[in-house]
Regions:
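Rhodanese-like catalytic fold shared by cysteine-dependent sulfurtransferases
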Residues: 1-89, 93-180
Length: 180
Protein backbone atom coordinates (compact mmCIF):
# COMPACT_ATOMS: atom_id res chain seq x y z
CA UNK A 1 0.00 0.00 0.00
CA UNK A 2 1.69 3.11 -1.21
CA UNK A 3 0.93 6.57 -2.45
CA UNK A 4 2.62 8.40 -5.28
CA UNK A 5 4.04 11.88 -4.71
CA UNK A 6 5.97 12.82 -7.81
CA UNK A 7 9.39 14.44 -7.48
CA UNK A 8 8.73 16.94 -10.27
CA UNK A 9 5.95 18.92 -8.56
CA UNK A 10 5.80 20.58 -5.15
CA UNK A 11 7.26 17.42 -3.69
CA UNK A 12 8.31 18.65 -0.24
CA UNK A 13 5.06 20.52 0.36
CA UNK A 14 2.91 17.51 -0.50
CA UNK A 15 5.05 15.04 1.43
CA UNK A 16 4.52 17.28 4.47
CA UNK A 17 0.79 17.61 3.82
CA UNK A 18 0.04 13.98 3.01
CA UNK A 19 2.42 12.13 5.35
CA UNK A 20 1.88 13.80 8.74
CA UNK A 21 4.15 11.38 10.64
CA UNK A 22 7.80 12.30 9.97
CA UNK A 23 8.81 8.91 11.36
CA UNK A 24 6.83 7.08 8.66
CA UNK A 25 9.00 4.54 6.85
CA UNK A 26 9.56 5.62 3.25
CA UNK A 27 10.68 3.50 0.32
CA UNK A 28 11.88 5.60 -2.58
CA UNK A 29 10.92 4.50 -6.06
CA UNK A 30 12.73 6.88 -8.36
CA UNK A 31 14.99 6.75 -11.34
CA UNK A 32 18.60 6.27 -10.16
CA UNK A 33 19.56 9.77 -11.32
CA UNK A 34 16.87 11.24 -9.04
CA UNK A 35 17.66 9.27 -5.87
CA UNK A 36 19.98 11.79 -4.23
CA UNK A 37 17.60 14.64 -5.04
CA UNK A 38 14.74 12.67 -3.47
CA UNK A 39 16.73 12.02 -0.28
CA UNK A 40 17.79 15.66 0.03
CA UNK A 41 14.30 17.01 -0.54
CA UNK A 42 12.80 14.58 1.99
CA UNK A 43 15.48 15.43 4.54
CA UNK A 44 14.92 19.17 4.18
CA UNK A 45 11.38 18.77 5.46
CA UNK A 46 12.28 16.35 8.26
CA UNK A 47 11.65 12.97 6.63
CA UNK A 48 14.76 10.95 7.44
CA UNK A 49 13.26 7.48 7.88
CA UNK A 50 14.00 6.25 4.37
CA UNK A 51 14.24 2.47 4.65
CA UNK A 52 15.60 2.01 1.17
CA UNK A 53 15.22 2.57 -2.51
CA UNK A 54 14.82 0.45 -5.59
CA UNK A 55 18.22 0.33 -7.27
CA UNK A 56 16.93 0.73 -10.80
CA UNK A 57 13.73 2.52 -9.90
CA UNK A 58 10.28 1.30 -10.81
CA UNK A 59 11.66 -1.21 -13.32
CA UNK A 60 13.21 -3.17 -10.42
CA UNK A 61 9.77 -3.56 -8.89
CA UNK A 62 8.30 -4.71 -12.19
CA UNK A 63 11.15 -7.14 -12.87
CA UNK A 64 10.62 -8.71 -9.44
CA UNK A 65 7.01 -9.44 -10.34
CA UNK A 66 5.71 -7.35 -7.45
CA UNK A 67 2.14 -6.10 -7.40
CA UNK A 68 1.47 -2.80 -9.14
CA UNK A 69 -1.57 -0.67 -9.67
CA UNK A 70 -2.50 2.16 -11.95
CA UNK A 71 -5.34 4.56 -12.45
CA UNK A 72 -7.40 5.27 -15.50
CA UNK A 73 -6.66 8.62 -17.09
CA UNK A 74 -8.58 10.43 -19.80
CA UNK A 75 -7.87 13.44 -21.97
CA UNK A 76 -9.74 16.71 -21.59
CA UNK A 77 -11.45 15.95 -24.90
CA UNK A 78 -12.67 12.60 -23.57
CA UNK A 79 -13.80 14.35 -20.41
CA UNK A 80 -15.80 16.88 -22.45
CA UNK A 81 -17.74 14.06 -24.09
CA UNK A 82 -18.49 12.36 -20.76
CA UNK A 83 -19.38 15.68 -19.10
CA UNK A 84 -21.86 16.61 -21.82
CA UNK A 85 -23.64 13.28 -21.35
CA UNK A 86 -23.95 14.01 -17.61
CA UNK A 87 -22.53 10.59 -16.79
CA UNK A 88 -19.91 11.47 -14.20
CA UNK A 89 -19.66 12.97 -10.77
CA UNK A 90 -16.73 15.39 -10.74
CA UNK A 91 -14.29 16.30 -7.97
CA UNK A 92 -12.02 19.34 -8.09
CA UNK A 93 -8.90 18.58 -6.01
CA UNK A 94 -7.55 22.16 -6.07
CA UNK A 95 -7.40 24.55 -3.12
CA UNK A 96 -10.67 26.27 -2.21
CA UNK A 97 -9.35 29.61 -3.47
CA UNK A 98 -8.63 28.10 -6.90
CA UNK A 99 -12.06 26.48 -6.98
CA UNK A 100 -13.76 29.71 -5.92
CA UNK A 101 -11.97 31.63 -8.69
CA UNK A 102 -13.28 29.31 -11.43
CA UNK A 103 -14.32 25.68 -11.75
CA UNK A 104 -16.30 23.27 -13.88
CA UNK A 105 -20.02 23.67 -13.18
CA UNK A 106 -21.16 20.78 -11.00
CA UNK A 107 -17.71 19.97 -9.60
CA UNK A 108 -17.41 19.22 -5.89
CA UNK A 109 -14.38 20.76 -4.21
CA UNK A 110 -12.28 18.41 -2.06
CA UNK A 111 -8.81 19.97 -1.72
CA UNK A 112 -5.99 17.43 -1.79
CA UNK A 113 -4.81 18.31 1.70
CA UNK A 114 -8.31 17.46 3.03
CA UNK A 115 -8.97 14.30 1.02
CA UNK A 116 -8.55 11.92 3.96
CA UNK A 117 -11.17 13.83 5.96
CA UNK A 118 -13.67 13.72 3.06
CA UNK A 119 -13.34 10.17 1.74
CA UNK A 120 -17.04 9.55 2.45
CA UNK A 121 -17.91 12.05 -0.30
CA UNK A 122 -16.40 9.84 -2.99
CA UNK A 123 -18.89 7.26 -4.29
CA UNK A 124 -17.88 3.61 -4.04
CA UNK A 125 -19.98 2.44 -6.99
CA UNK A 126 -20.74 5.29 -9.40
CA UNK A 127 -17.94 6.35 -11.72
CA UNK A 128 -16.40 9.76 -11.04
CA UNK A 129 -13.64 11.99 -12.36
CA UNK A 130 -10.98 14.00 -10.54
CA UNK A 131 -8.94 16.98 -11.67
CA UNK A 132 -6.65 19.65 -10.27
CA UNK A 133 -4.91 22.56 -12.00
CA UNK A 134 -2.47 20.60 -14.15
CA UNK A 135 -2.54 16.95 -13.10
CA UNK A 136 0.04 16.73 -10.30
CA UNK A 137 -2.29 16.91 -7.29
CA UNK A 138 -4.96 14.73 -8.87
CA UNK A 139 -2.32 12.02 -9.40
CA UNK A 140 -1.57 12.14 -5.67
CA UNK A 141 -5.30 12.11 -4.89
CA UNK A 142 -5.80 9.19 -7.25
CA UNK A 143 -3.05 7.19 -5.59
CA UNK A 144 -4.65 7.83 -2.19
CA UNK A 145 -8.07 6.80 -3.47
CA UNK A 146 -6.60 3.63 -4.99
CA UNK A 147 -4.83 2.84 -1.72
CA UNK A 148 -8.13 3.24 0.14
CA UNK A 149 -10.00 0.91 -2.22
CA UNK A 150 -11.54 3.14 -4.89
CA UNK A 151 -11.24 1.91 -8.47
CA UNK A 152 -14.21 3.64 -10.08
CA UNK A 153 -12.66 6.93 -11.12
CA UNK A 154 -10.66 8.59 -13.86
CA UNK A 155 -8.08 11.35 -13.63
CA UNK A 156 -8.28 14.10 -16.24
CA UNK A 157 -4.86 14.56 -17.86
CA UNK A 158 -3.77 18.20 -17.76
CA UNK A 159 -6.38 19.11 -15.14
CA UNK A 160 -8.37 22.34 -15.26
CA UNK A 161 -5.80 23.91 -17.57
CA UNK A 162 -6.72 21.37 -20.25
CA UNK A 163 -10.42 21.18 -19.38
CA UNK A 164 -10.82 24.97 -19.62
CA UNK A 165 -9.93 24.79 -23.33
CA UNK A 166 -12.86 22.45 -23.98
CA UNK A 167 -16.55 23.24 -24.46
CA UNK A 168 -17.43 22.54 -20.83
CA UNK A 169 -19.56 24.78 -18.60
CA UNK A 170 -17.39 26.76 -16.19
CA UNK A 171 -18.24 29.32 -13.56
CA UNK A 172 -17.41 32.91 -14.37
CA UNK A 173 -13.82 33.74 -13.44
CA UNK A 174 -13.47 35.82 -10.29
CA UNK A 175 -10.01 37.22 -9.59
CA UNK A 176 -8.95 35.81 -6.20
CA UNK A 177 -7.79 39.23 -5.01
CA UNK A 178 -11.34 40.61 -5.38
CA UNK A 179 -12.55 37.99 -2.91
CA UNK A 180 -10.46 39.42 -0.06
Amino acid sequence: NSINIGIDGNFAQWVGEMIPDVTQEILIVAEPARLEESLIRLSRVGYDNVIGYLKDGYQTWLDAGKETDSMDRITAQEFESIYKKGENILFDIRKKSEYDAEHVVGAINVPLNQINQHLAQFPKENKFAIYCAGGYRSMIAGSILKQRGWNNFVDVIGGFGAISKQDVAKTEYVCPTTML
